[in-house]
Amino acid sequence: LLNGLLLPSAGKVTVNGMDTRARRHIREIRRLVAMVFQNPDNQLVSPVIEEEVAFGPENLNLPEDEIEHRVEKVLQIVGLSELRQMSPHMLSGGQKQRVAIAAALAMQPDYLVLDEPTSMLDQSGRQMILEYLQILNKQQGLTIILISHNMEDLTGADRLILLQEGSILCDAPPWEAFNRGEKHLDLKPPGIVLLAQMLRKRGYLLDKRITTLEQMENSICRLLRSTT
């Protein structure tokens, strides 16, 4: 819906004020909104990594030197510069995801939409992808919309929207959503949040906004300093 691949059956979807139903806006909307699918194999079409990353910018009819600059830049961002001559189909699942992200970033979008980007990855690959996304958001200023059933993927988000059959059940910062305790939300908080909740019940005055291990460490250190 966000990039006009599907049109809404009711209401309308706008991107930077542009209606996705207006054909005159589709080219610009698809430049602004980049997509990374759940299975990267479904969107990797080129035999070589650098060609895959260059595919989108080439369709924008950009000068060759600009395309090369973008390819080099995004491959550095995702840490795949040394593999640029390899086939993406020879890579691991995590590396394929990084190629798909690089191809999306080469379009210089304002918004990056990722559908279950960690569902096919092991723990180390999952952590690597999530760290890349944090860097892109915090350092590059890219707006990221991450769709996931795994609440562990969402602990670093600024905003969590819980949907059920097309309706919004919850729209809040992750820490607030995880601590509401509303059974109808059917929301299982991440392990670190459950641990913080358990410690608070035992009388430890930990910050309610804890959603990550780093935040837990900082909160415990502050607590220890205040009691010495």
Segments the model singles out, each with a brief description of its role:
Residues 87-91, 95:
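Conserved ABC ATPase signature
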